[in-house]
Regions:
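Hydrophobic N-terminal alpha-helices or hydrophobic patches in metabolic proteins across all domains
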Residues: 1-166
Length: 166
């Protein structure tokens, strides 16, 4: 299964950018309150709707950071299941579909345990100092479960468009 991911935040940033889905412009939402930095390029899977009412989040494993607004054709390795103050807030872990350096990665276990712990630690603490924000229930699941969530998120977005007419 392949899909497009739009990057909002490059690896190593503390600035939290968001794409305004009405205008397409990139907005600085805030600087993270903690000293943590995004462990990988971070964005969303296009044409999806996650359980939190936003597009389904994604992390893309790359050798070099990209830039906000960059679109990458990806495939899933697994997913980090978590909840925040708005409900389900899963993060799909991906690699670029055409990157030969990543062709051997097909499952979550192909990502080192240490790197998975880095990602987990980031998402467990990155909202710690922000009033009214919380994170809970974080754990990793494999590619099959990630792909099922992606399919459900595509369907949620299609249903939303059918209901609202746009």
């Amino acid at each position: 299964m392949e899909f497009d991911v739009t990057i909002e935040i490059p690896k190593g940033n503390r600035n939290k950018y968001e794409i305004d889905h009405e205008t397409g412009r990139i907005r600085l939402d805030r600087m993270l309150f903690t000293s943590t930095r995004y462990p990988d390029d971070y964005g969303f899977i296009d044409e999806t709707l996650g359980e939190d009412g936003d597009p389904l989040d994604a992390l893309v494993l790359l050798e070099e950071p990209t830039f906000p607004g960059c679109v990458i054709r990806c495939r899933a390795l697994g997913m980090f299941r978590m909840r925040d103050e708005k409900g389900g807030d899963d993060k799909v872990l991906c690699v670029p579909a055409s990157d030969q350096r990543a062709s051997w990665r097909t499952e979550i276990d192909d990502v080192s345990e240490f790197h998975r712990l880095e990602i987990q630690h980031f998402f467990e603490v990155y909202k710690d100092l922000e009033p009214g924000k919380s994170v809970e229930g974080a754990h990793w699941v494999g590619r099959d479960e990630a792909e099922e969530e992606i399919r459900q998120s595509f369907q949620r977005e299609a249903d939303r468009i059918a209901r609202e007419g746009h």
